[in-house]
């Protein structure tokens, strides 16, 4: 039986010194040592032009049903400066969960590191 939506407001944040040690390690190597359990779909491509080649920060994870961005709206206000928002939407590539207005809010107001 499904338990419905859950939003965890308390986050266990990683130690900044430990995070910074990952700055020069390729993501593929990190994925390998985590049992190949933390990689993105290879169809996902970079669409921005980041200032730095590699970035490190805590992840705020969002699990949403395809086409349902309610959980993502909650994440907009939970995200902290420097966070990366990672969204799983049941691999639905037919509908977008966010657009330009939400992206601008995250970038300029919340100052997240990436999505």
Feature names for model-found ranges:
Residues 93, 105-115:
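Ligand/cofactor pocket segment of small-molecule handling proteins
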Residues 32, 104-105:
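Surface-exposed charge patches
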Residues 50-103:
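A glycine-rich, hydrophobic loop/mini-helix early in the fold
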Residues 22, 84, 105-108:
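Phenylalanine-focused residue identity feature
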Residues 1-63:
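Intrinsically disordered, low-complexity regions enriched in acidic/Ser/Thr/Pro/Gln residues
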Residues 42-45, 63-64, 86-88, 114-115:
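General beta-strand structural signal in soluble alpha/beta enzymes
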């Amino acid at each position: 039986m499904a338990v419905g939506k859950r939003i965890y407001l308390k986050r266990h944040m990683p130690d900044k010194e430990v995070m910074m040690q990952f700055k020069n390690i390729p993501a593929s190597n990190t994925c390998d040592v985590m049992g190949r359990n933390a990689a993105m779909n290879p169809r996902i491509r970079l669409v921005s032009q980041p200032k730095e080649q590699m970035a490190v920060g805590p992840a705020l994870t969002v699990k949403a049903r395809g086409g349902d961005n309610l959980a993502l709206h909650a994440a907009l206000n939970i995200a902290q400066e420097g966070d990366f928002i990672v969204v799983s939407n049941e691999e639905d590539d037919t509908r977008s969960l966010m657009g330009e207005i939400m992206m601008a809010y995250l970038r300029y107001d919340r100052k997240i590191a990436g999505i």
